[in-house]
Swiss-Prot record:
Pfam family, one: Methyltransf_23
SUPFAM superfamilies: S-adenosyl-L-methionine-dependent methyltransferases (SSF53335)
Biological processes per GO annotation: methylation
Pathway involvement of the protein, from the record: Cofactor biosynthesis; ubiquinone biosynthesis
Family, similarity comment: Belongs to the methyltransferase superfamily. UbiG/COQ3 family.
Enzyme class: transferase
Protein name: Ubiquinone biosynthesis O-methyltransferase
EC numbers: 2.1.1.222, 2.1.1.64
GO molecular function: 2-polyprenyl-6-hydroxyphenol methylase activity; 3-demethylubiquinol 3-O-methyltransferase activity; polyprenyldihydroxybenzoate methyltransferase activity
Organism for this UniProt entry: Nitrosomonas europaea (strain ATCC 19718 / CIP 103999 / KCTC 2705 / NBRC 14298)
CDD domains: AdoMet_MTases (cd02440)
NCBIfam families: UbiG (TIGR01983)
Keyword Chaperone (UniProt): no
Amino acid sequence: MDNDGINADPMELEKFSQLAHHWWDPNSEFKPLHEINPLRLNYIDEIIGGLSEKTVIDVGCGGGILSESMAARGASVTGIDLSDKALKVAKLHLLESGNQVDYRKITVEALATERPRYYDVVTCMEMLEHVPDPASVIQSCARLVKSGGWVFFSTLNRNPKSYLYAIIGAEYILRLLPRGTHEYAKFIKPSELAHMARSAGLMESGIVGMTYNPITKVYALEADTSVNYIMAFRA
């Protein structure tokens, strides 16, 4: 936590705020997010038995790529973030898409106090590796979900392969991401994520890896969790 008690890194917020106007450009720095979004959307949809009529909170929603796609499948979605610029872009895009998402600037910790046991589904994608205290985020996500509900986290594994692929490969060689997007020390092993989630009262339900083929330039969900992965938990 910073000195104001907010679980956010000001440098991380500024980094993504500077790129906010590119969120919905599929050929920008956010191209990987656009390309993996159908994969993670379908995974969530399948695991929970359909998003339609579910109440969903998207924690760290950024410009709203996942939030909007879940709303388009019939979910009642709230998206929260601490970047004013990203939220402005997200709200403006709703005018173009016609989707309905309630975007708010609030910490997940504060929302968990405001709306405990409120949501059927909690998603927190590509966020844990960017905050000072990921355990606090996980605990708050666990507080937000209804009993029997679902919580999804996606992040990066921490090992030599993930450093090679996610930082050296993605940021320096293939230039899929801007340099400095990730900090290796903040990567989280699946065992660490599972431990933090269990401590928050969640039960692990499944894990799937997300891979990228630099030859075909195609992302896929596979059993290999050595770099990117998504974990599903039940409350």
